[in-house]
Amino acid sequence: MHEYTGVTVLRRKSLFDLLLILGFSALAFAVMGYHPGIEDDGIYLTAIKSDLNPALFPHDAEFFRLQLQATLFDKWVAGLIKLTGISVAAMVMMCQLAAIVLTLYSCWRIARILFAEERAQWAGVALVAAMLTLPVSGTALFLFDQHLHARNVASALILLAVSWILAGKRWQAIPLLLVAFLIHPIMAALGISFCFFLTLALYEPAHLWFQSKRNATLAGAVPLGWIFQPPNPLWRKALDTRTYYYLYKWAWYEWLGAIGPLVLFWLLWRVARRRGENVLARFALAVFAYGVFQQLVAMVMLGFPSLVRLTPLQPMRYLHIVYFFLVLIAGALFGKYLLKASVWRWAAFLLVVNGSMFAAQRAEFSSSQHIEWPGRAPSNPWLQAFAWIRTNTPTDAYFALDPRYLEAPSEDYHSFRALAERSQLADAIKDTAVVTQVPELGPVWNRQLEAQRGWKDFQLADFERLKAEFGVDWVVVRYQPPAGLACQWHNDELAVCEIP
């Protein structure tokens, strides 16, 4: 009877924990919003649609396909869509929700091992849920993107692997890290690096060595010939548009955002060790040692002109997982020492952190619906144009539009390729980022951008020149359009026109 009662209580507790994780996941989704097709989704969502329909993008597939050669992410999502018959929009949103749930579940598992107090565990999860769109200093990354990104899924798997290592089950972490590597190799490599330091910190002889030496050593570098090849001038031109790639050009506050968390984890290690909180102390030591090592690696990689070919690897992305742990532990400490069991403190805490992040997201995507539900008619004028193009123009249509359209007021960084599902001439923002990763695209990118120089003053003769040079037969222009174009659709801001 007592055993049955104990099992029942345990099951109810597990169910309650699951419901809390799902509840915080729903809250996180509601706060951060959902914007398919923005920013990097111009690569991933476009590739998924191309996998499902190879007839799409006959003129410009290299601007997304080449960058994704090292990942299976788009193919796996496309495979799920084929297997289930669920629409692209619905499946992508479901995967985003699943990634949020897995991320918060993994954070909860970590918090349970680091903190004995249940209120601390849930406060940590609550703060992570609220702060998913927190920028990571200097890196142009968020903890979690507002669209389905390979990094979202890989990070969730890395966090789950960390929880297994903390639980003393290192072998369970290996397949998770391998899958993460197949999804996002760079983030997985950094995750593997952290797991290595965590394993060392939990290993008693290594922990004693850390305490006595308190330093980190750089591994020897293996020379690779391609690293020292002279860079393509057009590749350098694209690279120079990304100032966040250059560590030594960061502002002082970006440096503070990089070094400050490492100092905090060093302090946490010392305090937790004095208080006898052994696991928390070792975890903090692992984060500190990992951060110091990766910071030194980044300073070497980005400090010598001869190593410029390594710049697109963006070694400062190591901060991404550090910020995850910073938010998780900050929330847990807040819950342990300040929130405690006070309902009013918890209510104020949740209101402030979620309300402020929600307001920030509404300001960032002010012209779009906060959650862009599948099948819902868009209110954004650019998305209205993309929707018309997707259903009313030939699959092989080739478009030109303002090469800086992503920065246009009310556009909110939505990708034409991903949402209109048509080919376009290279743009000056997202395609430039692609060239930094794929140098061989430099000549094509530069030629197309130069041909679009002075776009705002284009007249019919300029559009006819694009048609003759590249085969472009459609354009998206501001309404009212230049005379002579055969316009098929317009709203108050934009017109979609054929080039005669």
Which residues does each PLM region occupy?
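Transmembrane catalytic cores of multi-pass membrane glycosyltransferases
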Residues: A28-L45, L52-A70, P185-I192, F197-Y323
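Short hydrophobic/aromatic helix or loop-helix immediately within or flanking a transmembrane segment
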Residues: L45-K49, F64-S87
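Aromatic- and kink-enriched transmembrane "portal" helix at the membrane-lumen/periplasm boundary
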Residues: V125-N152
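Membrane-interface transmembrane helices that cradle and orient dolichyl/undecaprenyl
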Residues: V153-Q172
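Signature aromatic-anchored transmembrane alpha helix within multi-pass, membrane-resident enzymes
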Residues: K336-F365
